[in-house]
């Protein structure tokens, strides 16, 4: 998911 959805999603996208 894009890095602007949620904090949790941010970390998932940052892997």
UniProtKB/Swiss-Prot annotation:
Its cofactor is Ca(2+); heme b. The keyword Transmembrane helix does not apply. GO terms for biological process: hydrogen peroxide catabolic process. The keyword Metal-binding applies. Keywords: Calcium, Heme, Hydrogen peroxide, Iron, Metal-binding, Oxidoreductase, Peroxidase. GO terms for molecular function: lactoperoxidase activity; metal ion binding. It is an enzyme of class 1 (oxidoreductase). Belongs to the peroxidase family. Classical plant (class III) peroxidase subfamily. Removal of H(2)O(2), oxidation of toxic reductants, biosynthesis and degradation of lignin, suberization, auxin catabolism, response to environmental stresses such as wounding, pathogen attack and oxidative stress. These functions might be dependent on each isozyme/isoform in each plant tissue. This is Peroxidase 2. It comes from Daucus carota (Wild carrot).
């Amino acid at each position: 998911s894009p890095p602007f959805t949620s904090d949790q999603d941010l970390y998932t996208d940052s892997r």
